[in-house]
UniProtKB/Swiss-Prot annotation:
Its cofactor is Zn(2+). Binds 1 zinc ion per subunit. This is Small ribosomal subunit protein uS14. GO terms for molecular function: rRNA binding; structural constituent of ribosome; zinc ion binding. Belongs to the universal ribosomal protein uS14 family. Zinc-binding uS14 subfamily. Disulfide bonds: none annotated. GO terms for biological process: translation.
Amino acid sequence: MAKKAMIIKQQRTPKFSTRAYNRCKICGRPHAYIRKFGICRLCFRQLAYKGQIPGVKKASW
């Protein structure tokens, strides 16, 4: 889990627009963010295994 202070700090609008960055909507993780879903890869994996993300299935080739 991300530090509460960093999550709150990130929610404020930054002084310069280039300082803005994405965080996971579930756990607040700043790295490995998947834009299409708005969550990090770890939360994505958990939700995909539970079947809570529609249209996502395990790849097989």
